[in-house]
Every structure is written in structure tokens, then in C-alpha cells.
């Protein structure tokens, strides 16, 4: 990883995840495996497992061949990431998160949203890199607010040097 922005993000993610482990007693970390922040977060959890071997690094994929249209290099890193995960959950195979009318193993925006819903439904704290724009991240956070399960939102602002703010969703 040589991109200065991603290196800064990695440092911020390591600090946030470390705090979640040591101060909030979180030990299960679920990422979606997507390019960018998801993969950076997964690798950060992997790094922190050396110091905190009890934590779990879980990848929730929206569909089986998420990497189908990615470059050879992206596919290689994705496979490596899957190999270091403690658990891989293929969300489209779970009854509660199935999208009717969609072909198994193939991309659809609805499957991406269902993957996000799965991650929210199985989490107590959310770490989001979010700039406020209309996006899958916004949909994910709206779902979290709507379903209210006592979530904490640890938001890193990409437009402001990944400044952190923490919100506790009120039911």
C-alpha cells in the first residue's frame, strides 16, 4: 500500500479498532470485502490479531464471486484476504438476506444492501468512512438508524483528514 491517503486511513483504522478492542471490549469485526475501505479494515484487524489473538476477523461477502470483474492484482489480494479471515459468510445464501429474482453468485445492488444489512444486524459498533454523499455507506447508516440495535457509529471523515466522531444512536 503506497497511496498516502490509504496509508493515513490505515493508521486511523488501526487506532479506532484498537480502541474498540481495548476500551469497548469488541472482539468480532465484520467487513464486506469490497475494494478500498472494507479491505483496509480487514487487513487492520489481521494486523491487530497479533496483539489481540482473541479477536475475530469476519468477511461478509454479498455474493460468491464478488471479485469477478476485478483486476488480477485485486483478485490476488482478495484471495489472500479470504485466506486470513477467521470466517467467511456468503450473505446471499442466508434465507433472511436472499434477494428474490436474482441469480446466485452474480452482482446486484440489492445484494450489496443485504450484505450491509447483515453486517449491521450482527454488530454493536459501526466504523464508517463516510463523507455524507449519497452512497451505499449512506444506505447502510440509514438502515442502522432505522433498525436501532444500540449501535455506536465511529465515523471517519475522509474530507477532513479522517477526523473521528462517535455517535450513539438513540432509539
UniProtKB/Swiss-Prot annotation:
Protein name as it appears in the record: Uncharacterized SPbeta prophage-derived protein YoqJ
InterPro entries tied to this protein: YspA
Database matches in Pfam families: YpsA (PF06908)
The organism's taxonomic lineage, starting at the top: Bacteria, Bacillati, Bacillota, Bacilli, Bacillales
Organism: Bacillus subtilis (strain 168)
Amino acid at each position: 500500500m503506497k497511496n498516502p491517503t490509504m496509508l493515513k486511513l490505515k493508521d486511523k483504522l488501526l487506532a479506532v479498532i484498537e480502541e474498540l478492542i481495548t476500551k469497548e471490549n469488541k472482539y468480532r469485526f465484520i467487513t464486506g470485502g469490497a475494494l478500498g475501505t472494507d479491505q483496509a479494515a480487514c487487513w487492520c484487524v489481521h494486523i491487530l490479531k497479533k496483539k489481540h489473538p482473541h479477536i475475530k476477523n469476519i468477511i461478509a461477502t454479498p455474493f460468491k464471486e464478488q471479485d469477478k470483474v476485478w483486476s488480477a492484482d485485486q483478485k490476488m489480494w482478495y484471495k489472500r484476504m479470504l485466506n486470513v479471515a477467521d470466517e467467511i459468510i456468503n450473505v446471499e445464501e442466508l434465507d433472511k438476506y436472499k434477494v428474490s429474482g436474482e441469480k446466485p453468485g452474480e452482482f446486484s445492488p440489492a445484494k450489496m444492501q443485504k450484505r450491509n444489512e447483515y453486517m449491521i444486524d450482527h454488530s454493536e459498533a459501526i466504523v464508517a468512512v463516510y463523507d455524507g454523499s449519497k452512497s451505499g455507506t449512506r444506505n447502510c447508516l440509514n438502515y442502522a438508524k432505522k433498525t436501532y440495535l444500540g449501535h455506536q457509529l465511529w465515523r471517519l471523515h475522509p474530507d477532513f483528514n479522517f477526523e473521528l466522531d462517535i455517535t450513539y444512536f438513540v432509539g
